[in-house]
Structure formats: C-alpha cells, structure tokens
Curated annotation (Swiss-Prot):
GO terms for molecular function: ATP binding; proton-transporting ATP synthase activity, rotational mechanism; proton-transporting ATPase activity, rotational mechanism. It comes from Thermofilum pendens (strain DSM 2475 / Hrk 5). Component of the A-type ATP synthase that produces ATP from ADP in the presence of a proton gradient across the membrane. The B chain is a regulatory subunit. This is A-type ATP synthase subunit B. It is a peripheral membrane protein. Has multiple subunits with at least A(3), B(3), C, D, E, F, H, I and proteolipid K(x).
Length: 460
C-alpha cells in the first residue's frame, strides 16, 4: 500500500511537529507522506535532521495522528503541477484547490524552490505597468520586472490597495498577455473572503491565480506560499510568454513564520530573534522576479509588508529595502484625514521609474511633471509645518500658494476612489490641473516647450 521506504512510529508529537527516530537518510525540506490510522494521506516537510533523527512538520489536518503513524520519505522537495489551467483558480497554501473545482491533473511538475535569475541573463526593466492608481503611476511608476514593495502599518488599508492593483493593473501595447498571481500569506478568514469577493465580483479572477495561506495553517506552509506563487508565475511568464504581476500580502507574516521555524530547529537567533539568514532567504524570493534575455514574458513583484510598530529600522523592512528597487510608504496621518490610498509621497521611491516612462511608454511630459509635482509638494509640506508654528496668516504669499497646492494635490491627485481606475493620460492631465494653481514661473523643473504643450492655460 505504501511503496518505497516507510518508517512506522513517532517518538514524540509536539503540536504539528513529529519527532522521528531511527531515520537512516533524510534531507532538509524533503517531502514526507504521512498516514494515520484512517490511512488518509497527509503531507509534511523535514524541518531538521540529525544522526538517526528527523523533525517533520505536518501540513494541514493533524487529527488522528498518533505514535504509530506511518511516514514515507519521498527523497524529493515539494513540487506542484502547472499548466495554463491554473488561471482563474484558487488554491490553498499547499496548492490544493479550494474553489470546488478538480485539481490540476495535466501539465508539468515543477519544484517550488526555484532559483534566482542569473544576473548575466537579466534584461534591464524598461516597460511601464499601469495600476490605475495615480500616486503610483504618476510618481512611483512600476516597471515590468521590478520589485516594488509597499511598506505599511497594521490598521492601514494595504489590503484594499492590493485588491485594487490586482483588479486594475495592466500592460500597454497590443497583443500583450497579462496575468496576476496573488499570494495571501497568513490571512485571516475575513481578509481571504474580502479578496475572493473582490476578484470574483469584478471579474478579475479570469486572469488571476490566487494562492491563499490562512493564519491558522502551519508556519511551514507560509514559507511555501510565496514560492508556489512564484513557480506559477515563472511558468506563465517564461513558458507562456505572459507579463505577470505577483502580489504578496503580508510578507511580515512570512518572516514571522521563518523565525518560528528557525526557533523550532534550534538555530542561533539574530536580530530580534529572526534567523541570521533572513536576508538571503528573502533574496531567494525577490530575485526570482525580472526579465530574462530572449524571453517575451516578465515577472513583476509587488510585496506588501506591515512594519512592526511602524519601525523602518525593524529587520523586515530594513532587509527588504536592500533587495528591492524602491518602496512605497503608507501614511497613518493621511489615512486619518480620509485620503485613500494614503501614500506618503516624500519618502517613497521607484528606482526604475525613469526607464519605464516617457515617449512611446507613457508620455513625453511624464518625467518633468513627476519631478515638479514632487518638488512643489515638498515645499507645500514645509509651508504646512511652518503654519503649525506661526499660523497660516504669518506665511508669505508664496508659501500660501504652495500650501494650497499641497492640499489640492492630496485631495485631488493622491486621493481617489477604491473602484476608480485612472489611465496614465488621466493621471498626467490631473497632475497638470493641480499644478495650474501655481504661477508659471514656479514650474522650474519643466521645460517651457512642455509647459506650452500640456499646461491647461495653453491647451484651453
């Protein structure tokens, strides 16, 4: 009934961990098939090995497992079957269907561990992805193949933003195929229901693959979920020539699971108890995104993480910032003012933006307009800080203009509806409309010929 080498008996059961003695050969991350008294097949992964002993983490249901449990060590790591049929499907964190449809039976078996893209094989990202969110498209443009994270804080609407981007994101150009892979990591039930409702009601599910790991699932499953999502994305991008946007929420839950598993293995902890290899572990995930020379498809990564205590120096955001190509911050202050999405403009950055905008990609005025909006808004924020000290009446006429600009910029440009999908042309035109509050002589970062072509005063 159980082909291959099978071990009967478990020395100890600690929650979802099985301690097995008398093991001759076992490897870290090896898949183990587990059979209880009901003969039902379960799966586990080897967390730790030593001479004659192995620690196995059970994936999924643990009911009915006792000390006389049967374990079969398969000799391979976790694999999933991928094909074009994955599009439109919803899976759990072990890639088992949870949408009432049958499992994927045809296609290729792929190991989920994967490999980062060889730097020599990489092509520099240079094509624009439209999210429909003005603050992102206009000021921190996302480029195909980029790794652009959202740095948030618990209580802010990062899940709303993730759902909106998943619904609205698209690539420009005829004949370009686009798909979204959504990885929910450590989601609460209400969060998972929200995402599924959004994807199904808006029709986004038709071009989307969802891999949902729940908060009550084993920690080791959270370590698998982003890798499963990226394995699916690699197949769609590099085998089917699609442009794939991978959204991961919340990577903080992934890092917490990494710390939990590391502690269970008895490893020496690093900063705040996180393993010393967390940086390289995150890199094995993030560096799977990109564009490969000679391949038509691309993988763009949009991870979302909540900074514990809002601390940017916490190991999770700190290490993430070294790997990714920019970051977008969400602001508690702007959220309290009723602004959605509450994107904190001044500390946010997209390092690859300039390669993905301009003539033939977005519009010739995009770069100049973004620079001017950022500059004017920073002056407006300084004027607001000054007004808090001396009062608005004490400001110069120039500072009052910039203060008014900052308010209009936040309320009209940054602020937009959850179901409002703005094209890049609408975003840029709106930017010019807000800039028209300022005198033309203040637009020092825009060439005169661009002003005369796009400024509302000349266009009207």
């Amino acid at each position: 009934m159980y082909p291959g080498k099978v071990y009967r008996g478990v020395k100890e059961i600690r929650g979802s961990l099985l301690i097995v003695d008398g093991i001759e050969e076992a490897a870290y991350d090896e898949v183990v098939k587990i059979y209880g008294k009901d003969s039902r097949e379960r799966f586990g992964r080897v967390l730790e090995t030593s001479i004659g002993q192995a620690v196995v983490q059970v994936l999924g249901d643990r009911e009915g497992l006792e000390t006389d449990t049967l374990l079969k060590f398969t000799g391979s790591t976790f694999k999933i079957r991928v094909s074009e049929d994955v599009i439109g499907r919803v899976f759990n964190g072990r890639f088992e269907p949870i949408d009432g449809l049958p499992p994927i039976l045809s296609g290729e078996l792929r190991e989920i561990t994967g490999e980062p893209i060889n730097p020599i094989s990489r092509e520099y990202p240079h094509d624009f992805i439209q999210t429909g969110v003005s603050a992102i498209d206009g000021l921190f443009s996302m480029v195909r193949g980029q790794k652009l994270p959202i740095f948030s804080v618990s209580g802010l609407p990062h899940n709303l933003l993730a759902a909106q981007v998943a619904r609205q994101a698209t690539v420009r150009g005829e004949g370009e195929q686009f798909a979204v892979v959504f990885a929910g990591i450590g989601l609460r039930k209400t969060e998972a229901e929200f995402f599924l409702e959004q994807f199904r009601e808006t029709g986004a599910i038709e071009r989307l693959v969802a891999v949902l790991n729940m908060a009550d699932d084993p920690a080791v499953e959270r370590l698998m979920t982003p890798r499963i999502a990226l394995t699916v994305a690699e197949y769609l991008a590099f085998d089917l020539d699609m442009h794939v946007l991978v959204i991961m929420s919340d990577m903080t839950n992934y890092c917490e699971a990494l710390r939990e598993v590391s502690s269970a293995r008895g490893e020496i902890p690093g900063r705040l108890g996180y393993p010393g290899y967390m940086y390289s572990d995150l890199a094995t995930i993030y560096e799977r995104a990109g564009v490969i020379k000679g391949k038509k498809g691309s993988i763009t990564l949009f991870p979302i993480l909540t900074m514990p205590g809002g601390d940017l120096r916490h190991p999770i955001p700190d290490l993430t910032g070294y790997i990714t190509e920019g970051q977008i911050f969400l602001s508690q202050e702007m959220y309290a003012q009723g602004i959605y999405p509450p994107i904190n403009i001044l500390p946010s950055l997209s390092r690859l933006m300039k390669s993905g905008i301009g003539p033939g990609k977005t519009r010739e005025d995009h770069r100049y307009l973004a620079d001017q909006l950022y500059d004017a808004y920073s002056r407006g924020v300084k004027a607001r800080d000054l007004a808090r000290i001396i009062g608005e009446i004490g400001l110069s006429e120039r500072n009052r203009r910039f203060l008014k600009f900052a308010e209009e910029f936040e309320n009209k440009f940054v602020n937009q509806g959850f179901y409002e999908n703005r094209s890049i042309e609408e975003t840029l035109d709106l930017g010019w409309q807000v800039l028209s509050i300022l005198p033309e002589e203040e637009l020092v970062r825009i060439p005169q010929k661009i002003i005369e072509k796009y400024h509302p005063k000349y266009r009207s």
